Amino acid sequence: MSLPQGSDYHGNGKLYFKTHKENDMKYDICDYKDIIETHKDFPIEGIEYLDLNPIYKNPIYRDALVSDCMGKIVDMIPPTFDYIGVVESRGFLVGSILAHLLDKGLLLLRSKPGRLPGETKKISHTLEYGDSQMEVQTGKGRVLIFDDVLATGGTSQAATDVLTMGGYTPIGALFPVELTFLNPTLSIPYESVIKY
């Protein structure tokens, strides 16, 4: 995978941009945390929301994040999995790009029942700010779970459980962002790119 013109190397939660100044190469470093925006009291009072949209809006930042996620997948697990299970809806964007680049199937984990046809399994779970449900179409195969943020681990554990109920084998999970101060727990191995 190649990055758009103007970027060179990235990794370890930082972006490195190549610039030309008097025919000498210089690298400008930008931390992902400088790009991600925080919004207090969203979606409810007392929650500080991390907004990854500034990364998604910029093709260089987005492609750098995708590349860092690819590196984590290669480091974390063998390439013998069938699907990337993307959690609605913020996992859909980068997760679908990863599935395309890795030539893997895309498995949708929907947050509201009734959005998937055919035989499904669903589970209720608790979020940091309320209750939710998750639903998946039944099937078979090995699944890498992808969501944008790992907070307490409740959503990811629900994804693990509903996939198992649906006949799949969850083999790991990947997150662009992990909120380590919330001490997330998950019953399967996981990796993250940016740690708070």
Describe the residue ranges of each PLM region.
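PRPP-dependent phosphoribosyltransferase catalytic core
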Residues: 9, 28-29, 34, 157-196
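Active-site-facing substrate-recognition patch
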Residues: 13-80, 139
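Short glycine-rich phosphate-binding loop at a beta-alpha junction
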Residues: 79-88
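Conserved acidic residues
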Residues: 82, 141, 171
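Short Gly/Thr/Asp-enriched flexible loops that form oxyanion-binding sites at enzyme active sites
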Residues: 93-102
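Short, glycine/charge-rich flexible loops or terminal/linker lids adjacent to PRPP-binding catalytic cores
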Residues: 104-144
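Acidic, divalent-metal-coordinating active-site segment for phosphoryl/phosphodiester hydrolysis
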Residues: 147-160
